[in-house]
């Protein structure tokens, strides 16, 4: 029981850390890029913010994978974010994984795992 409560508490702590102003700024810049890119606009890739936000979600994914954080809590609150980031940044993720296959691999796995048979928003590629 204690371990289960610890996993839930760790998940809550991770979710609270996502509310920090600097994390929200990273996410805002990345979402703006994703939205503009989906509309066909050519915009500069905010690489620093993308790497920071994907790195943050990779850390959360590792915590879920190794049982430190409760998967259901993370999935219920962040599933859409995982899918949106993964689908919106798939070209970038694929590019960096060509050089280093393990980069963002846990994040990518959770995004794919949690994206089960649901209608995706218009910004998502269908290939």
Annotate the PLM regions:
Residues 44-127:
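An amphipathic alpha-helical interaction surface
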Residues 40-42:
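Short, positively charged
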Residues 1-38:
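Membrane-proximal alpha-helical anchors
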């Amino acid at each position: 029981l204690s371990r289960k409560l610890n996993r839930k508490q760790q998940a809550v702590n991770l979710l609270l850390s996502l509310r920090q102003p600097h994390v929200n700024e990273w996410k805002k810049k990345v979402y703006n890029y994703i939205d503009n890119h989906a509309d066909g606009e050519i915009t500069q890739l905010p690489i620093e913010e993308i790497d920071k936000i994907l790195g943050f979600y990779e850390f959360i994914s590792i915590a879920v994978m190794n049982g430190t954080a409760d998967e259901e809590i993370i999935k219920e609150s962040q599933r859409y974010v995982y899918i949106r980031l993964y689908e919106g940044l798939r070209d970038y993720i694929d590019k960096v994984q060509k050089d280093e296959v393990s980069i963002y691999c846990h994040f990518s796995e959770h995004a794919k795992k949690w994206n089960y048979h649901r209608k995706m928003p218009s910004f998502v590629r269908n290939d």
